[in-house]
From Swiss-Prot:
One of its GO terms (molecular function) is ATP binding. InterPro entries: AAA+_ATPase, ABC_ATPase_HisP-typ, ABC_transporter-like_ATP-bd, ABC_transporter-like_CS, MetN_ABC_transporter-like, P-loop_NTPase. It comes from Bacillus subtilis (strain 168). It is an enzyme of class 7 (translocase). Part of the ABC transporter complex TcyJKLMN involved in L-cystine import. Responsible for energy coupling to the transport system. Is also involved in cystathionine, djenkolate, and S-methylcysteine transport. Keywords: Amino-acid transport, ATP-binding, Cell membrane, Membrane, Nucleotide-binding, Translocase, Transport. Its EC number is 7.4.2.-. Pfam families: ABC_tran. The keyword Transport applies. One of its GO terms (cellular component) is plasma membrane. Residues 2-239 form the ABC transporter domain. Belongs to the ABC transporter superfamily. L-cystine importer (TC 3.A.1.3.13) family. This is L-cystine import ATP-binding protein TcyN.
Length: 259
């Protein structure tokens, strides 16, 4: 279980996160939705200390980390439990596809190159890129680059997968291939926290949907509660603007609840 308590973050005078609390059970998929500038990405980056919160506690496996004063050892430990899939891919341009996936295994996990190659090859096969092992990022489509990013995250076998708007930078025609890969990951029982603008994806796969605005959690609950039985006017206003059909038309929910 992951417990996040009272996360605050300021950039100058701008209070971006105002006391965020969230509990995520093992095997849950939590999607975070909301308008641009609401603090979603900053919150996600705080979870592995890519952004250092000004205040707050993160607990994983009963290990409690004070985000204001984490030791180097605690930062390293927390980053080993999590893996981030970035909106802009963050691939090394001078490395091949398989070298990009191997990087975290050989550098952070100190794995032998031969073993790292086998792991990376297996993960790339899972995301349908077994024929692109020796290609460079410049030779890939946006969807393929993001699938490399997903394979890289999966390769280190993290306890929690963090996705920062993984389809936001993609051509609309390429969004589907990335969402299909993510759906397959959901079916494995992975613990996932996903910042997304893909409302149908959020509704179909989530155990919890979290709606953020202006640095706070305005509303959270099951997809049924948030999309169909919305309690807060601000949430309803957002949903009507971005996805009005979800207030009126039920659709299939594919995620089995975590017991």
């Amino acid at each position: 279980m992951i417990e996040i308590k009272n996360i605050h973050k300021q950039f100058g005078i701008h209070h971006v996160l105002k006391g965020i609390n969230l509990t995520v059970r093992k095997g849950e998929v939590v999607t975070i939705i909301g308008p641009s500038g609401s603090g979603k990405t900053t919150f996600l980056r705080c979870l592995n200390l890519l952004e250092r919160p000004d205040e707050g506690i993160i607990s994983i496996h009963d290990k409690v980390i004070n985000c204001r004063f984490p030791s180097k050892k605690e930062v390293h430990w927390l980053r080993k439990q999590t893996a981030m899939v970035f909106q802009q891919y963050h691939l090394f341009a001078h490395k091949t596809v398989i070298e990009n996936v191997m990087e975290g295994l050989t550098i952070a996990r100190k794995m032998r190159k031969q073993d790292a190659y086998a792991v990376a090859e297996n993960e790339l096969r899972k995301v349908g890129l077994q024929d692109k092992l020796n290609a460079y990022p410049s030779q890939l489509s946006g969807g393929q680059k993001q699938r490399v990013g997903i394979a890289r995250a999966l390769a280190i076998h993290p306890d929690v997968l963090l996705f920062d708007e993984p389809t936001a930078a993609l051509d609309p025609e390429l969004v589907g291939e990335v969402l299909e890969v993510m759906l397959e990951i959901v079916k494995t029982g992975a613990t996932m926290i996903v910042v997304t603008h893909e409302m149908e994806f959020a509704r179909r796969v989530s155990d919890q949907v979290v709606f953020m605005d202006e640095g706070v959690i305005v509303e959270q609950g099951t997809p049924e509660e948030v999309f169909r039985h919305t309690k807060k006017d601000r949430t309803r206003q957002f949903l009507r603007r971005v996805s009005p059909e979800y207030l009126f038309e039920p659709k299939e929910h594919i995620k089995e609840p975590v017991i």
